[in-house]
């Protein structure tokens, strides 16, 4: 009886500890007995069908030995039929917390913990074990404390890392980082350079202000000498941003992650602006000083000028008052250098450089005689000092000379022109045979093209539109300038559209196949596309050329994948946006776009958005309706009419790519570029999306 009472208590405890989803639903019978209705839950938690009172089948329950042809009985009656030795143990029952460290001592036949009560015998056994293993328990406690301390330390480190990660991925930090990369770092570099000029100028002005010559010539002398020192400084620095081979090498180093090399031309323009302004100040200061010297010399009758006490001049050297202005070494060299700078600055303006690049090219090379004249400008030693300009410019001029020697050596070999294609909208495509050993380039880079038949020393930059894996080198030339028109007439005198390589391969014109020379390749902003898993490529008109090379490269890399599980692209998504006024312009690259659309693996990551901003014809409206493909581009991607709404585009991008980095690449006119970078900066950081803008120097 005692065993039955203990067992009854244990069963009641089991029912109390069993979760609700594993307990049988209990109903109170009228006579006060408990019965089971509905589905019974087995040990495994799987409900079994309800047992009918008239069921004649032999159903065995692992918990209770229920007689088949007998209605449910009370628990007291069932206890009499129980096999105490074979009581099953529900898997959900857990050992009470008091047995946490002694589970190995309390177990049943099936090695599962039982919720047994603490009898006096069990307490004695537990105390004995605790006494015998007191040292071991203390040791385990110390180990646990050390483990907890280590865990706490790791948790603190993880919390710090998590906090740091949250800060770096926060909207404010992304905004600051985006501003720093787009404008901040270049702004600070330019401000630092301006501050350097101010510092050098203030130091020079202070020294001249306290010199003896100041007593005679006054402030005009201080300003002219200060400007002369700044001319030397800017003449030394202005050559560094135009070392194309050096900058191309620098793009492949870690420096490219911290310095905006893409904006090297902006720094070059800043140096040119400082150089031109300092030259004007230098000339005005000397005009005033020369006037003072002439007035002083004309007052002297004994042949000795008062200025001779301060300057290295004599009245015999002054046959007339215009001598210092136009007949002395400083006067002659100074005016020639001033004229050279005026020509260089004026030819660099967009309205002249864009349609007449050859003028810009030739005039810019006048910097060579400018440097030579600068070295001899102070040769007469009027200020009783040796000339110092050569010490400033010797090092950068040597670097530039090495740069030019590399270009000359690399551009001697002529390339074979295999194919020339005249596209609509006055675009000429040239395909040249590639020498894999001497010309290796990256997608997005550019080259310089020379045609000796037109001008032997004239080189023009063009973006490479072929992929590095292609067996040819291709460029697309927009016929807008004098040189490009001459090249077009040379290759296509009959002004035909389409393929014209048959004429090149003919016996009569076979010599034309070797009429071109190339120099390069050179680095460009578009080659940084591999740094991002999400890309936005925006091209306006002929500005699509850098992205043609990128898309062809992705196509070639995808073709190399023999296994569907391989991923040579390492790109998650590409948004290609092409904007043009003329519908015929889209025929330039529709072949590669169609191949990309037909490739399932690339089509899944590539979205093509084409915008036509020009007017449509009446036939276009009829063809647009119910068309399976766009009749303008012959692509599955529909052509959109009008200008793209970049505010909406970037807003959607930040929603689709939350907590991701997107590289935005643009090549086109400045007005559209300002709109893009404005919206790029506006939505940068929204949803923790980092938008990084790269602009091609177009």
Swiss-Prot record:
* Residues binding heme, per UniProt: 268, 282, 364, 377
EC number of this enzyme: 1.-.-.-
Q: Give me the gene this protein comes from.
A: noxB
Record topological domains on the Extracellular side: 206-229, 291-324, 377-388
- Subcellular location, in the record's words? Membrane
- Which stretches does UniProt call biased (Low complexity)? 54-65, 138-156
Domain Ferric oxidoreductase span(s) in chain numbering: 225-375
Q: What spans does the record annotate as topological domain Cytoplasmic, numbered to this chain? A: 1-184, 251-269, 346-355, 410-698
UniProt-recorded name of the protein: Superoxide-generating NADPH oxidase heavy chain subunit B
Q: Which organism is it from?
A: Dictyostelium discoideum (Social amoeba)
- Pfam families, sorted: FAD_binding_8, Ferric_reduct, NAD_binding_6
């Amino acid at each position: 009886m005692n065993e039955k009472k203990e067992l009854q208590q244990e069963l009641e405890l089991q029912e109390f500890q069993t979760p609700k989803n594993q307990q049988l639903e209990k109903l109170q019978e009228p006579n006060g007995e408990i019965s089971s209705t509905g589905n019974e839950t087995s040990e495994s938690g799987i409900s079994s069908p309800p047992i009918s009172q008239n069921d004649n089948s032999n159903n065995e329950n692992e918990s209770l030995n229920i007689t088949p042809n007998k209605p449910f009985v009370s628990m007291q009656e069932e206890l009499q039929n129980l096999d105490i030795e074979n009581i099953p143990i529900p898997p959900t029952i857990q050992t009470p917390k008091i047995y946490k460290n002694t589970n190995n001592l309390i177990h049943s036949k099936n090695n599962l913990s039982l919720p047994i009560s603490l009898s006096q015998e069990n307490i004695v056994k537990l105390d004995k074990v605790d006494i015998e293993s007191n040292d071991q328990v203390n040791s385990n406690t110390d180990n646990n404390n050390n483990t907890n301390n280590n865990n706490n330390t790791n948790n603190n480190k993880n919390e710090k890392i998590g906090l740091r990660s949250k800060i770096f991925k926060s909207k404010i930090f992304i905004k600051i980082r985006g501003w720093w990369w787009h404008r901040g770092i270049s702004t600070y570099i330019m401000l630092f350079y301006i501050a350097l000029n101010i510092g050098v100028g203030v130091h020079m002005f202070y020294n001249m202000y306290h010199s003896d010559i100041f007593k005679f010539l006054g402030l005009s002398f201080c300003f002219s000498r200060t400007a002369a020192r700044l001319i030397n400084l800017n003449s030394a620095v202005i050559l560094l941003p135009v070392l194309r081979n050096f900058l191309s090498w620098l793009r492949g180093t870690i420096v490219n992650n911290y310095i905006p090399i893409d904006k090297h031309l902006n720094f070059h323009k800043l140096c040119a602006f400082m150089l031109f302004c300092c030259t004007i100040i230098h000339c005005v200061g000397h005009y005033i000083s020369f006037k003072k010297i002439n007035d002083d010399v004309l007052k002297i009758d004994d042949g000795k000028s008062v200025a001779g006490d301060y300057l290295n001049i004599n009245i015999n050297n002054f046959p007339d008052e215009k001598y210092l202005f136009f007949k002395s070494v400083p006067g002659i060299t100074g005016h020639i250098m001033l004229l050279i700078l005026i020509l260089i600055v004026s030819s660099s303006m967009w309205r002249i450089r864009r349609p007449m690049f050859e003028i810009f090219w030739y005039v810019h090379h006048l910097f060579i005689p400018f440097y030579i004249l600068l070295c001899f400008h102070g040769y007469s030693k009027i200020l009783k000092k040796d000339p110092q300009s050569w010490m400033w410019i010797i090092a950068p001029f040597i670097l530039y000379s090495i740069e030019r020697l590399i270009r000359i050596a690399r551009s001697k070999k002529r390339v074979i022109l295999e194919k020339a294609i005249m596209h609509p909208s006055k675009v000429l495509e040239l395909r040249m045979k590639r020498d894999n050993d001497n010309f290796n380039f990256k997608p997005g880079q550019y080259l310089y093209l020379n045609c000796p038949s037109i001008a032997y020393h004239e080189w023009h930059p063009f973006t490479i539109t072929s992929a590095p894996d292609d067996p040819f080198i291709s460029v697309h030339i927009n016929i807008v300038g004098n040189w490009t028109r001459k090249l077009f007439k040379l290759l296509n005198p009959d002004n035909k559209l389409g393929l014209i390589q048959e004429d090149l391969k003919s016996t009569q014109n076979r010599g034309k196949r070797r009429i071109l020379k190339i120099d390069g390749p050179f680095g460009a902003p578009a080659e940084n596309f591999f740094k991002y898993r999400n890309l936005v490529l925006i091209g306006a008109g002929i500005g699509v050329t850098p992205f043609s090379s990128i898309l062809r490269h992705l196509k070639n890399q995808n073709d190399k994948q023999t296994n569907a599980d391989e991923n040579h692209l390492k790109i998650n998504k590409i948004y290609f946006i092409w904007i043009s006024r003329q519908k015929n312009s889209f025929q330039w690259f529709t072949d590669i776009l169609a191949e990309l659309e037909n490739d399932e693996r690339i089509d899944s990551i590539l979205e093509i958005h084409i915008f036509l901003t020009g007017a449509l014809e009446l036939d276009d409206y009829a063809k647009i309706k119910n068309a399976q493909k766009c009749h303008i581009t012959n692509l599955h991607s529909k052509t959109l009419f009008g200008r793209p709404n970049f505010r909406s585009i970037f807003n959607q991008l930040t929603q689709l790519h939350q907590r991701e980095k997107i590289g935005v690449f643009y090549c086109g006119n400045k007005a559209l570029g300002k709109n893009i970078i404005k919206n790029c900066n506006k939505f940068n950081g929204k949803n923790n999306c980092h938008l990084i803008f790269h602009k091609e120097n177009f």
